[in-house]
Amino acid sequence: MEAAKYGIGIVLDGVFSHTGSDSRYFNREGRYGEGGAYRDPNSPYRSWYDFDSKYKGGYRSWWGFETLPEVNEETPSYVEFITGEGGVIDTWLRRGAAGFRLDVADELPDEFIEKVRTAVKRVGPDKFLLGEVWEDATTKFGFDKRRTYLLGKGLDSVMNYPFKNAVLGFVCGRDAGQTMTDILSICEHYPAPAL
């Protein structure tokens, strides 16, 4: 990879909680012939999605956006497609990517994130897994349980929006003492490797 010659690592955005309605896997618009989960009840991708008339458009979608059908991250064939040997993670890391940023990591089950991590580290221990988590990743509660992003079996780090908010608040005139308190709180919560 050309970027590596200059000491630059490319981190890809892994959007694994949903696909586009126009993807070859869902194919709502028919761009890929008659195949795809939306058009073919016998599609190998059909089990990746939740089709039900109770949903707008007839399928579960990310935050109700019909162009973003949600996938079931617990479907074995989907998990294998993303994390298996020769899967998405394996392919792109072996082509030279430095790691992945997991889009909406706080909406992915911990078990799925752990499988993604295993796939990433299988390619190389230096490969990086970053997660989009909007709140304090050490105290996040979701899916009816405390999340385990930074306990050694999930993410290497997170986007750290609380830090961004503290810095932007200071730049926009927020009290320096409160900013310091916020930043020190983040440093106390997060394990050093995740900072």
Model-identified regions with their sequence ranges:
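Residues that cap or delimit alpha-helices
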Residues: E85, P109, P191-A192
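Residues at alpha-helix caps and immediate loop-helix transition turns in enzyme cores, especially N-
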Residues: F112-I113
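Active-site rim elements
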Residues: P76-Y78, R101-V104
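Conserved, well-ordered alpha-helix/loop/beta-strand core segments that scaffold catalytic motifs
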Residues: W92, A98-R101, E107
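Structural preference for beta-strand elements that scaffold enzyme active sites
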Residues: G7-V11, G99-R101, D126-L130
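Short, solvent-exposed turn/loop segments enriched in Gly/Ser/Thr/Pro and often Arg
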Residues: G14-S23, D103-P109, E132-A137
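Conserved alpha/beta catalytic core and glycan-binding cleft of carbohydrate-active enzymes
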Residues: S21-D22, N27-R28, E34, I89, ...
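Substrate-binding/active-site clefts of carbohydrate-active enzymes
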Residues: M1-R94, V116, R122, T139-K140, ...
